[in-house]
A protein has these predicted regions:
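C-terminal glycine/acidic-rich active-site capping loop/insertion
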Residues: 124, 246-323, 354-355
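Beta-loop-alpha module in the N-terminal Rossmann-like domain of NAD(P)-dependent dehydrogenases
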Residues: 20, 38, 52-111, 304
Length: 355
């Protein structure tokens, strides 16, 4: 029945669990062997969708057909379920964030080494089209030397009305969206070390956990990266704003509206000043049209199903994993530094963590 397929057992059939089943329907090398959720109504829902359902976590972990346990539960549950699954002989995919601290992650890594099981994390935003466009621009030096990147996601509805509002479950925007945006930046600049971290958190709609944050990362070589998440923003700033010595790129929204503006090399011998309310300025005057060139953003398309295809290749063929545990640990330690900076209102010298 399962010949040549990698069989997943899914724990957690909430929003992300259902989303995983939709994605996996397009990955023929993987089959969902069954689903377990602690809530009976979720198990009933999964059964009505045609999935096999387990009556307990133990029943799933004792099923010899299951190769991989995919954990899509609240954040605080990831670590204990993953450890039990690996001890039961299962490979593990955890939803992000993998857990709530770097020490917890180290425990999970130790169990993976002890049991010889594959452990990875679903960092799916590496396949976002907007990120892939920015990565292409940076790698191809389309803007020359990039000296500043701004990465933002803004919403206006606060934190979703579930466990993400609660500290005990690992709620808050640093752990929810920050883990994505920080992973993208560290993946983009994988070989460059962070020198300093400064951050602030917001508590506009929630006093228990952060409902937004801003952090500024300074990388070796001087590149500065601003990462920001807001949930009480009724006018959103651009998703990406990238400044290079030879030009600027902007991606305004999820629909990939944006453009690139680069200098042509033509020198303005005489700058016409622009009139402002309180006087003239040449410094802030717009450039002459013949000194710049406007270009469309390149087309780059990602496929999130590639994450699961890679997992199947790792399990079946010993392929290199796309999401590596040292990368996950680096993101986790960076989030801890963000919390530390926000709590102390201090710039963190991050070089001690980048050895």
């Amino acid at each position: 029945m399962w010949e040549n397929k990698v069989i997943y057992g899914l724990i957690g059939y909430g929003g992300m669990g259902r989303w995983h089943t939709e994605i996996l329907s397009n990955v023929p090398e993987i089959e969902i062997g069954g689903i377990y959720d602690i809530k009976e109504e979720k198990r009933i829902e999964a059964k009505e969708k045609g999935f096999s359902v387990y009556g307990s976590e133990e029943e799933m972990l004792s099923d010899p057909d299951i190769d991989v346990v995919l954990i899509a539960t609240p954040n605080d549950c990831h670590k204990p379920i993953a450890i039990r699954a690996m001890h039961a002989g299962k490979n593990v995919i955890s939803e992000k964030p993998v857990t709530l601290s770097s020490s917890d992650l180290q425990e999970m890594v130790n169990v993976a080494k002890e049991t010889g099981k594959f452990l990875t994390v679903h960092q799916n935003r590496r396949w976002d089209d907007d990120f892939l466009i920015i990565r292409k621009l940076v790698e191809e030096q389309k803007l020359g030397h990039v000296f500043r990147i701004e990465s933002r996601v803004h919403g206006s509805r606060g934190i979703p009305g579930d466990w993400r509002k609660e500290k005990i479950h690992g709620g808050g925007m640093v752990l929810d969206w920050g883990v994505h945006l920080l992973d993208q930046i560290l993946y983009l600049y994988g070989n460059r070390k962070i020198e300093t971290v400064y951050a602030s958190l917001t508590h506009i709609t929630n006093q228990e956990v952060d409902d937004g944050f801003t952090t500024i990362l300074t990388f070796e070589g001087g590149t500065e990266v601003l990462v920001e998440v807001g949930t009480n923003n009724y006018i959103s700033l651009p998703r990406w704003y990238v400044l290079g010595e030879d030009g600027t790129a902007v991606i305004r929204d999820w629909q990939l509206n944006g453009e690139i503006i680069r200098k042509t090399g033509i020198t303005e011998e005489k700058v016409v000043p622009v009139k402002t309310a309180a006087g003239l300025t040449k410094t802030m005057a717009p450039r002459r049209e013949d000194t710049i060139v406007k270009e469309a953003l390149p087309h780059v398309s990602g496929d999130i199903a590639d994450f699961h295809r890679n997992v199947a290749a790792v399990i079946r063929d010993g392929a290199e994993p796309e999401i590596k545990l040292f990368q996950v640990m680096r993101v986790m330690k960076l989030m801890e530094a963000i919390f530390q900076s926000a709590e102390t209102n201090q710039v963190i010298d991050y070089r001690q963590y980048e050895t």
